[in-house]
């Protein structure tokens, strides 16, 4: 492992089993019903707001993911600061979800708030650059090792633009992603592998083009499958997280990412690393922590402290393949950016966040807490003899209801247990803890405390005791 930031021990994983106990599924169902009643009883204002919202908002929320939380309705928030969220019923929560990484460095970090507030008074958007944009480009180049950068509004946009540039550079149309991935609402990446066929992701709206025309899908950690897929030399780009996170954490096997680099270079394929979630590995993301050499990097979510902003960077070689000239000299519609992209407010927030929030000091606080969170969960799993596991990537921790960590998306998807998942999340929610609703993921922020981690450890043990056979 290349340790760009020596204080980080990026990955933590232990498998300690003495014996297995069975979870009593009937007890889980009864406990879930009880927790559901308690939730509805203690959140009357959120319930009332949800009923009102359903009359004007599709699904009763401004974005459909917000109904993924446990309970009959989402909690409505009045404020969020640091590692705390307070709802309209006056209940306070320790937040380990942190906006599903958008607030990975805390809600409303002071430096970001000050910079954004000051910039709003000076002007929000002009479709002209500010000095902040220069600083941000230089800082991203320093951190991630790629020399040229552009700004986007979301990581979805950054991924979409990166794929467009890869197609321009290679003259190829297809892209390759990994089963179980998520790279935003990019049509080519909202796919899954079903009996060897590329299909639309379950639950997604139909894409405009058959995904088998645009996309190849292989399993993570399977170099032979990747080699077969790339060998026709018809793939413009491999888009991937260096460790999968959106179906739970899946770590790369030893030598796997080196193999990906070798195969993409050999076949003339652009290697794009999506660091949006794996930025948890260190100030320069997984790329710098492990000394990776991608052709492009995309990132978003926490880069502006939670304000809509993202970025993508490219190598000198890719820049010189007419891409740089195309961007520098072409005006009008080239398929990259939008009217509000690179606005002054976003760049001011990005600069403040990069300079004063996403710092080495922050990781020195976050990573040890993640290690403790991971150890507490694994300790409980061991003590109760459950066939579960916990895994850590930097400041991110995940636990699953399966004995061994999955090696790919198919194994991760097969390990899902919706009943247990909903029970654990609702049990936590009723006791003042927010986990990421899509899976059992927790993030530590610079504001997270040891007391917060201890609270989760105790509640986690209590939740297990109530459902043992």
Annotate each language-model stretch with its function.
Residues 5, 14-15:
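N-terminal regions of proteins, emphasizing targeting and processing segments when present
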